[in-house]
Amino acid sequence: MTQLRIQATFVVDVWDGVDDEKVDGGPVTARVELAKTYTEGDVLGTATGHMATTQGPGGAAYVAQERVTGTVGGRTGTFVLEHRATQVGSGEPVTWAGIVPGSGTGELAGISGEGSLGHGTLDLTVELP
């Protein structure tokens, strides 16, 4: 296995959100379809996926999965990236990102790893066979 730290930047091309039914006094929840382009760094390609979000006066959270198609460290294929964040009040969000086990295809078959995802940035430590 080869271990790599991969860092990449991305832009969000599509953010199509639909609010769920509102609950009096409850936070706003929504479902989002998204598309991204990974533009620089160790990941180059595109991604499409889905996200669920919750936002209220006491905090916010989201969970998402996206299928990334492109190259990682020069290897071509696809994998599914799962990521989430939780924020209490106006504090800093706590984030996590990881590759769904067994989701890699092509030259990325067997890829695994985890790290973090921020506004426009991805930072993972991955293992490739």
Which sequence ranges carry the predicted segments?
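Beta-strand-enriched cores of mature, soluble protein domains
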Residues: 1-129
